[in-house]
A protein has these predicted regions:
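Transmembrane helix-boundary elements of multi-pass transport/secretion proteins
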Residues: 13-16, 24, 35-137, 146-149, ...
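Single conserved hydrophobic/aromatic residue that forms the stacking wall/gate
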Residues: 1-12
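Extracytoplasmic/secreted proteins, especially bacterial periplasmic and envelope-associated proteins
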Residues: 21, 25-28, 32
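Oxyanion-binding "anion nests"
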Residues: 141
Length: 282
């Protein structure tokens, strides 16, 4: 049922985009015809009637914003940026700590009790628990207080947001520990801030429809935890969706948790072995 509803939602989005394109084209054609022939019609009317027709409004349009009630750029973009900020800063913290461990050689202390999968898994879970606790407190301020202070759209259920944060923080922590493969010092992760910012907003599907992206960008959407989490959070918080309506993104985050947990265990074991060999060769 969930797969059927997701497919139906994708079809609806595509049809809606086609409808918008056809509506814009037909409106443009009608306005062009009106500009061309309306002046010729006014020639045959009395002057007092012509002035009334020119000033008349044939249709009174009253617009009502469904979600972004202020229709501002900030209220549209900032909710998505909040999740990206959490992802970037958590990734940066994990990268700096992991890079410092490798640079100083202190990572070898984890080899004292062996390098079995169970031992490495306990190390990864322990680190992830600390990161998640700290960022849960950070999320209370960022996602709970900031929308109230700045009048951002906030019509979602806080329980649903909390349910979404659990796999998001886990997946981000495991992703960061797996990415420590590339960090050999504490300065390298700082470069990720400028690299990821704009791209993550694009990949999330908030600023540009995911259905219109090339297939490789759609694949990237399901690889980086921030992308599905951002899309799900905007739907939950700004559009009032339920957790079932963001089921695809929610399941994606849990799948990422499993994949990146296993990858983080392998990467950390490799980093420990590499540091141990370097220490023994001295």
């Amino acid at each position: 049922t969930q797969g059927y509803s997701s497919a139906a939602s994708d079809v609806y989005k595509r049809q809606f985009l086609y409808y918008m394109a056809m509506q814009e084209a037909s409106s443009g054609a009608m306005l062009a015809l009106n500009d061309r022939y309306r002046p010729e019609m006014l020639v045959f009317l009395p002057q007092q009637d012509a002035s009334k027709i020119v000033s008349a409004q044939p249709i009174s349009v009253v617009g009502t914003a469904l979600y972004n009630f202020t229709e501002g750029y900030g209220t549209y973009l900032i909710p998505a940026v909040l999740i990206v900020i959490m992802f970037q800063t958590l990734l940066m913290v994990i990268g700096m700590i992991s890079g410092e461990e490798r640079d100083s050689g202190t990572i070898v202390r984890f080899a004292s009790e062996g390098l079995s999968f169970g031992r490495i898994a306990r190390v990864i879970i322990s680190k992830t628990f600390v990161y998640c606790v700290l960022y849960t407190i950070f999320a209370l301020f960022l996602l709970g207080l900031i929308p109230l202070l700045f009048g951002l759209p906030d019509i979602g259920n806080y329980l649903n947001t909390l349910i979404l944060l659990i796999p998001f923080l886990l997946a981000t922590s495991f992703f960061g520990l797996a990415a420590s493969y590339f960090f050999t010092d504490s300065e390298a992760p700082l470069l990720m801030i400028a690299f990821f910012s704009v791209g993550l907003i694009f990949l999330s599907g908030v600023s540009y429809p995911l259905e219109l992206m090339p297939w490789y960008w759609q694949m990237a959407h399901y690889i980086i935890p921030a992308a599905p989490a951002t899309l799900a959070y905007v739907q939950l918080n700004s559009m009032g969706a339920s957790i079932e309506q963001v089921g695809v993104e929610y399941v994606t985050l849990w799948v990422q948790c499993v994949v990146y947990f296993l990858l983080a265990c392998w990467v950390y074991r490799r980093n420990i072995l590499k540091a141990s060999r370097a220490l023994s060769s001295l």
